[in-house]
Amino acid sequence: MKRPLEMAHDFLAEVVNQDDIVVDATMGNGHDTLFLAKLAKQVYAFDIQEQALEKTQERLNQARMTNAQLILQGHETLDQFVTEAKAGIFNLGYLPSADKSVITQPQTTIEALEKLCHLLVKGGRIAIMIYYGHEGGDLERDAVLDFVSQLNQQEYTAAIYRTLNQVNNPPFLVMIEKLERYRHG
């Protein structure tokens, strides 16, 4: 059985190609940025921590990837850099090996999700990995689930991929796809 992060990558890889612009809304250590850079024409990656940019740039350099723009700003500013996107990924929570008090916040995450949903091309997808075992994580989890569950079903399909028998708040995946055409009925 695939782990949620593997499923997230597969979900995006099904639709992203070398002509596409994509977003890594939470750069972190750069694993998703590198994954997307190997698939897409251009990656816009966001984080508010300098350490994230440094680690990501190092990872990209080692792989000789030059098609990622690393942006030291919150993901809620993505519309200042991106006019349309084929896909996006969020890893919500905190940067491993960094200050665990610096966490993604419900307000800015929802703002970023709203903007990315609007900028998605038809057939585009968003993968949201939700880590919620830390203080404040449950609030963000609930805000994201509330936002996604209210997306217009004529425009989007949304699903959850999660393990049911794991303890200690296992991370789970929320998937959004912008429909190719409106469905009626």
Predicted regions and their residues:
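Conserved beta-strand signature within the Rossmann-like core of class I S-adenosyl-L-methionine
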Residues: 119, 123-130
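Conserved SAM-binding motif I beta-strand of class I
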Residues: 42-47
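Helix-to-beta-strand junctions that scaffold the AdoMet/dcAdoMet cofactor pocket
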Residues: 17, 65, 120-122
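Class I S-adenosyl-L-methionine
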Residues: 137-185
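Mobile active-site "lid"/loop adjacent to the S-adenosyl-L-methionine
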Residues: 93-111
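Conserved SAM-binding loop of SAM-dependent methyltransferases across substrates and taxa
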Residues: 29-40
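S-adenosyl-L-methionine
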Residues: 1-21, 54-84
